[in-house]
Structure formats: structure tokens, C-alpha cells
Amino acid sequence: MKHPAYTLLLSLIMSMCAGSKGLAEQLTKENLTVSLLPPNFHKENTVTNDWIPEGEEDDDYLDLEKLLSEDDDYIYVVDAVSPTDSESSAGNILQLFQGKSRIQRLNILNAKFAFNLYRVLKDQATSSDNIFIAPVGISTAMGMISLGLRGETHEEVHSVLHFKDFVNASSKYEVTTIHNLFRKLTHRLFRRNFGYTLQSVNDLYIQKQFPIREDFKAAMREFYFAEAQEADFSDPAFISKANSHILKLTKGLIKEALENTDSATQMMILNCIYFKGAWMNKFPVEMTHNHNFRLNEREVVKVSMMQTKGNFLAANDQELDCDILQLEYVGGISMLIVIPRKLSGMKTLEAQLTPQVVERWQKSMTNRTREVLLPKFKLEKNYNLVEVLKSMGITKLFNKNGNMSGISDQRIIIDLFKHQSTITVNEEGTQAAAVTTVGFMPLSTQVRFTVDRPFLFLVYEHRTSCLLFMGRVANPAKS
């Protein structure tokens, strides 16, 4: 029996807060207005309905022709901010803003944060460890939390997440612009009928009698489609209910997201993402075979190697000495496979990965018939991001001096920020996409693209330029 080709990716983020006015005033001050949601909107366990806020498609998903003809705010942002020394050496990231919609601009900075976070995780791992994260889920969760942050705590988060860079890029941008764009991004990504399944749940659980501000609850609902629900964290029934909810969303792939909770926990944020996509160019099951995969200079393992032939976009980066292949999913999502030519080249590639580099790859790609060999793999990763985020400069959020007065009048300390994610890549899922050549040599002499050594992968949604998932496969034979 033949099955449609697909890839499964999912991510779960948990943030727990244990026991520390102004959001309404802030929103009023910045003249922020949002459309009201249908009464039953939040009863959906995924944000996949077809509700379209008035005017949003016209404002944030513009074609380049519209950008050039209607609004110079989308064209000359680079002139508004001078690049720093570090950015000058690698190319000012704000230059990527030209010709981009506001949502694409926000996602460029979300990707910059994701690559920095990835590097911290990489430094904590060994070279033989696989890595997998869902950047869109992490950024969304941090955006939600930042609604209630004040003072230096708010500044730290906005600086590390590069939200501050976004606001400084244009006089027309404000802090509340970011939350509005996350709202629109969530709506765009999780609508139906794009040829793939992408589902998300944002749940906010609050210990009974814990005084969460009503304006914070309302803002969570409006901007991030997150419902605040009462919970008794000491009650095993709560864990069972939460796990059942996540089990249903992830189609059984994450069975016990919550093993136990501290009775002192007062707030928990769950962000869960599930993705299932069909490859544009399918991998015939009968072509899968055992193949050598080089772990390092000394070790080789046998893996199940998928094989197909078709038109694929690819490029070669001589500076980073790597090859790039784009595998396209049905519906406007693609996976970039990035493989160093030398086994020793992964460190350099990881150190220099930036949004500028990715855009140059995409612009240098050429389309031709290629034979592709890609190993099947499944990754399951579970991270507590507290120490990771601390090392990146977010410290006050996780200590008693943090200012979360926009969430509660009582002091709150976040002691757990859990990120759990799973990806399954097999014959039932793959993809590819295109652009023009700028400064890179195309893979003109190579007709076979063989992924037989450690590689990186990046999963993007094209219309929003959103980095959904990324990771490193050092050994396809283990999770």
C-alpha cells in the first residue's frame, strides 16, 4: 500500500513560573487596536481556521511591485539605522529588509536569534550529538511572555530577541507592532488549505487563586491566541489532561510531555507545533537502501538512504566550502540541506550561519535535474532553555529581580522553559524552491547530491520567510 510522502515535525515549549500595571495603559498609550475574534475562536485546539482580520492581507503580505509603488517604509529602512562594526563585517542585516514585508523583516531577526541560540546549544553538545529546535515556537513564546515584562527585564528580552533592532529600524515601528505581527504570522502559518498540516497550540495554565492581570490575559488572547486556564499543578489529573491535549495535537508523537510539576509552580506556558508535509518530489520506497554515512574521519555507520531523481534547486558556497540543496514541500514550505564538503567543515559552517548567508544561498541557486540521496532520520530533543537564554543575556527574567508586573502584582520567577521537539523525515516527505545566481558557483558539474556525512537542515515558510525548524544531523542512526 502506497502512502503520500510526508515529513513530520513537532515542537513543544513549556515555560513555568514560580511565585514574585500597565499593559492596558501601554496599549492605550501606543494607540494599538486589534480586531475582535469570533466568540468561539479559541475553542479550536489549533489556529487553522479561515478567519481573516480586516485589512491584514493588504498590509503585511505585499508583493515587491506593491512595495516599490506604495510605501517607501518598506524600501529605505536600511538608511534609518547605521550598521554596527560586527554587522558591517558580515554585511548589515538591515540591508535584508529592503523589499521585504514587515512580517518577513521580523522573521529575519527571529532567524538571527535562532542561529545564535543554536550556537549555544551546539557549544553545550558534543560534535556527535544531533540538534533540533523550532525557532518560531521559541520566539512566539518569548513574545508572549514579553507582553507582561517591564523595565530592564523587558529590555533584556527585546535586545536578545532582536525585537529592539526591529523597532529601531523605522520610525513607524513600535513595540506593539511586534505583537501585532506575531498575531498575523500565527494566523498566516496556521490557516488551512496550503497543502500541508501545520498546527499550533498556545496554552497558559495558572495556579488557582494566582492573581494574573486581566489585561495580560486579554492581550495573550488577542495577539497569541493563548487561553489562560486554571490549574492545580499538584493534581495528577492536570498532568494527565495536559498530556492528553498534547498527545492529540501531535498525533501521538509526544506521549508524556509533562512527567511531573512542582507544586510551587504558579504559571506554565505550553507552546506546541505540529507539522506534516508532503514532498514535492517523492522518494520511492523501493529505492531506499543501506548506505554508508561517515560520522567522522574514523567512524562509519549504515543508514537507510532514500533516493530520488527530479528537478531541484542547489548551490555551492566556496567560502564556507559547503553544498546546499532545497527540497520543496507541497504548499510553499521548503527544507534546505546544507552539507560541508569536509567533515571538519561543520564548525566553520555553524559559526558563520546568519540570515545574510542563507539569503545568499537562496539567491545563488540553479535548477536542474539531480539525483538526491538523503538518509531517513528521526530526532527527538528536550531542552531546558533557561541556562541557554541566560548565557545569551536574558538573566533578570529568571531571577527574583525580574520585573513581570505586567503579568501579576505579585513577584514571579520563571524556573523552567522547556522546549521539546520531534522531527521524522522519510520517504513520505520532501521539497525544493528557486531564485537567481549572485556570487556563488552553481552545482553545474554535479548531477548527484549525496548526503552521506553530518549536515544542517533549515525549514522555511516562503511567503513569510519564517524559519520554522532547524537542526543538525550528526548521526541519522540515533535520535
Swiss-Prot record:
The modification Sulfotyrosine is found at residues 61, 74. CDD domains: serpinD1_HCF2. Residues 55-79 are annotated as: 2 X 11 AA approximate repeats, Asp/Glu-rich (acidic) (hirudin-like). Keywords: Blood coagulation, Glycoprotein, Hemostasis, Heparin-binding, Protease inhibitor, Repeat, Serine protease inhibitor, Signal, Sulfation. Glycans are attached at residues 31, 168, 367, 403. Residues 1-23 form the signal peptide. The record marks 443-444 as: Reactive bond. Sequence repeats lie at residues 55-65, 69-79. InterPro entries: HCII_serpin_dom (IPR033831), Serpin_CS (IPR023795), Serpin_dom (IPR023796), Serpin_fam (IPR000215), Serpin_sf (IPR036186), Serpin_sf_1 (IPR042178), Serpin_sf_2 (IPR042185). One of its GO terms (cellular component) is extracellular space. Residues 172-192 are annotated as: Glycosaminoglycan-binding site. One of its GO terms (biological process) is blood coagulation. One of its GO terms (molecular function) is serine-type endopeptidase inhibitor activity. Pfam families: Serpin. Different composition of the N-linked oligosaccharides appears to yield a 68-kDa and a 72-kDa form. Thrombin inhibitor activated by the glycosaminoglycans, heparin or dermatan sulfate. In the presence of the latter, HC-II becomes the predominant thrombin inhibitor in place of antithrombin III (AT). The N-terminal acidic repeat region mediates, in part, the glycosaminoglycan-accelerated thrombin inhibition. Belongs to the serpin family. This is Heparin cofactor 2. It comes from Rattus norvegicus (Rat). The lineage of its organism: Eukaryota, Metazoa, Chordata, Craniata, Vertebrata. The gene is Serpind1.
